[in-house]
Amino acid sequence: MSTSFENKATNRGVVTFTISQDKIKPALDQAFNKVKKDLTAPGFRKGHMPRTVFNQKFGEEALYEEALNSILPAAYEEAVAELELDVVTQPKVDVKSMEKGKDWEITAEVVTKPEVKLGDYKNLEVSVEESKEVTDAEVDEKIERERNNLAELVLKEDAAVEGDTVVIDFVGSVDGVEFDGGKGDNFSLELGSGQFIPGFEDQLVGKKAGETVKVNVTFPEDYQSADLAGKDATFVTTIHEVKAKEVPELDDELAKDIDEEVETLDELKAKYRKELEATKETAYNDAVEAAAIDLAVANAEIVELPEEMIHDEVQRAMQEFMGNMQRQGISSEMYFQLTGTTEEDLRKQYEADADKRVKTNLVIEAVAKAEGFEATDEEIEKEISDLATEYKMEAEQVRSLLSPDMLKHDIAMKKAVNVITDSAKVK
């Protein structure tokens, strides 16, 4: 095989390579055996046409396309490897010559991975807003949330205050005309919860059961229903019941009701503190990692990012997201319907930071290469086991979905992230 590469622009060029006769002849034989199954000729049964008869009738050239399709992928990969090119997109292939008895000449327009010139990526000084410290107030707040979850609603005769729950009927209208979705019966509404549009709940504070109130509000300009956005509306609202939230005493009995594994309130506080410390430790480490990687990327120099890489990253991110949705039993159609968004909205969301994600991956890959990181067999097996556990799959299923090269790449990337993060110093 002869190969050459002609640079056309930054990160773009043309690979020229030949496919030799020792590869072409077996491919032609294979192509003939495939197509002859459906061919007939006078004096021969279907599928038994001799090669000489085929060549006389159709010409050997009729097999070229089928033969090329079978050998082109491997030939292209061999050429790229020989030229030591790091290609990032599918090539645009063109056949230059396919003459009988001669080597075939092929060209492929390719986009190559940008060159990354690493700056400092070790011992970086970073600052993060997250704190690992857990305060008494945070522990108390967590217990208070659980305490409120155990609260009971008790009927009251007094006027409603914020935090009370009212049971109401309501009928909404704009300019005296009722609108779809503006009516409800025996609806339970916690005042101050923000369930309804701004101003609605405030006008029920101070009211008692049995009262009927005209609640005047204005729909937000960005309201989901365009027909109502920005318009004034009146809701005739009848209050049937007012209920106060009665929370249990903050004592050892409450602690046992919240968590059967503890006996006292102090034990519950200690357990919650430990849980919060673990959560904040993770958040802190994630913040340090993000800050360190961002700085390593900022310190690096990347020569012109190809648009194709950004496009591919958007596609990858969208497919990954929708795949996660499907694993939760939510189809793409259902997701867009539930969120009131479109595929184009999702695309724009991922396009917003695709450039950053691609640059980040390139820098991490460059660090892995600079450090000479590789994956051992033991590390590959552990990665497969971890993925199988995470996605509730059999190890063999993971092996069938991920190639060894992909696993090795992911492990090397993790090592690179660790070398950036572990050496970082927080200001």
UniProtKB/Swiss-Prot annotation:
Entry annotated with the keyword Ion transport: no
Enzyme class (EC, first level): isomerase
Main location: cytoplasm
InterPro entries the record matches: PPIase_dom_sf, PPIase_FKBP_dom, Trig_fac, Trigger_fac_C, Trigger_fac_C_sf, Trigger_fac_ribosome-bd_bac, Trigger_fac_ribosome-bd_sf, Trigger_fact/SurA_dom_sf
Compartmental location: Cytoplasm
Entries under NCBIfam families matching the protein: tig
Alphabetized HAMAP family for the sequence: Trigger_factor_Tig
Name of the protein in question: Trigger factor
Originating gene: tig
